[in-house]
């Protein structure tokens, strides 16, 4: 039987001469060339069915429908009597995707972009998409100044209609800016203007921001910087007329020319506010006041608009429109600001939801909210909730979204999206140190116990000079009003002589409890009561120690040189503790802005064996240098003072110390300040006042009753760390300074003869500088620092590299 076949080659040509005006009836549909695609799937994508009478338009629609599936490179439709024959060539399946030569763009990012374009393993390969991808990647390289870059897609056929896809990159080098020319500037020099750019034709060694490598985005940012510079100085008619970027023939150098018109300076003649002000006209006008003769300032105009939006947002107007239309008078060189305000609808909050708190209970987050459900929306209250969640320290990140309720004109839902971090730490370690010998440490700390927000911890230390155990518990919401309750129990056996301190042994234990009372958003007060028992023994006579014992009426027998007293002194003390805290940091760990400050006082109450008070102050402030918070300046101040009451002195075992990773880095722990002046008594001596001082042993630290420590840090982005881990690592350069002194110290002929310094001086500041790295590891915060002492005194001990677990600042 002769077969009559006709090919429909183009959708634009008619086949009426073949099929006739009435077309033909499809009795069967037959496919040729199908491999991966099932016949049923192909039939479903066609608009033609067996029994249909079809014509030219139907054939065209069939071809278009099959191409639209993305499975075929070629489609042909033929007729054999009443049978419709569909010949197809399937697109090959992608078996693998690899990259070569890409250094500036990571594989993961490339895969994400390819998948967004439909190019992924297991899918059909669209060769036309590859051309677009090649061009898009090359355009990206051009935008970052790599004009010699090329991207080539290499397709390697495999059996069973499969292919390997490989993108081969030739990145080349970044074109460097040879010169930046500014044409049209009169009031300011080109050097002054270019100094504000990120792109530079010359970069001084100290400039860590400037860059000679051309990037299109950075140029756009620099042009905006230039525009803002002039608009903020009254040049209301300033305009950038054109920008030319030209390449050198070898595509390695770039010349940038910026043509601009400065215009003249304009002053503000007045401000008019009109529109729907929602009854807050007086407050809004207070935000738009100007000084007589004030220059036009673009940034101030923007700030006015933002302030008006924030004001209306506090009253529930979540989506106000504020548009400023400058009315420029070229005759007298003035500008009048016409501010149009549309407050819009007033919204109230239907629901507050939390997303991502898999461990923390909703109630723990909800009690931090200042925005209430059912109340008018206050944007400032919503932001306060975000800040309070960040300060908890339970979350790596906190984001908030305000969404309109569909179909309701005046309701919104507020959703806080949190990413929880590990708030519990368990550590066990065995180490060896030159001072501590073999050391065992173990501890468990959970700042968000079972998601309740309560903090529970137990820790212990065992080494050559200390055995310490502590159990602590804090409930930050002991009452619904936010009154906190904390308590601790501890035991400590401390052999100071083995810790490079003055010779004595102290066995102490105690219990304490504290109530905290919130005053407002950022301030709180604390009051508590502690009981502490101290049992002192093995005391080697030295001036500060025996001065204290004499003040409390203890006069042990004089011992000879090198021996320790057999005296056993016990003290039972009750302390009243009070304190004030201020905190407006933007987050609980690794803050970037805000201040944390605290002042504390404790005093021994009647019935105690000791009579003294102790005051401490600690403050840290963070000042971001960039909007991203990656560059931050931090300043910290710590100070303390203690003194006796009723003629008694402060116990030497409760002195202040400095030096080490938590105070003045670069110095050994607790070694800054007064040293022990040991008595050197001969046989038969009856009073220490007649004994000379041992001038050969002035190294053991004894601390003092006054302390001051200052720190300044520049927090910088951590190099070689991806954005994924940047939030858990912090690098900083620092300068530390501090001292400890004894206000009750008096040099005697014996101490002078032994060469003992005057420990009453507060001016003997030690200074160090260095670099620190903090890492919020799965084991808890790890702190590494390397510091070099810049200013030190006799008897100080250096320690350049220091490492600490569980401490951040």
Curated annotation (Swiss-Prot):
Signal peptide range in chain numbering: 1-20
- Keyword Transmembrane helix included in the entry's annotation: no
How this chain assembles, per its entry, is:
Part of the Bam complex, which is composed of the outer membrane protein BamA, and four lipoproteins BamB, BamC, BamD and BamE.
Q: Where in the cell is it found?
A: Cell outer membrane
UniProt domain POTRA: residue ranges: 24-91, 92-172, 175-263, 266-344, 347-421
Q: Which UniProt keywords apply?
A: Cell outer membrane, Membrane, Repeat, Signal, Transmembrane, Transmembrane beta strand
**Protein's name in the database:** Outer membrane protein assembly factor BamA
An example Gene Ontology biological process: protein insertion into membrane
Q: What does this protein do?
A: Part of the outer membrane protein assembly complex, which is involved in assembly and insertion of beta-barrel proteins into the outer membrane. Constitutes, with BamD, the core component of the assembly machinery.
Family the entry assigns: Belongs to the BamA family.
Query: Organism's domain of life?
Result: Bacteria
Q: Which GO terms describe its cellular component?
A: Bam protein complex
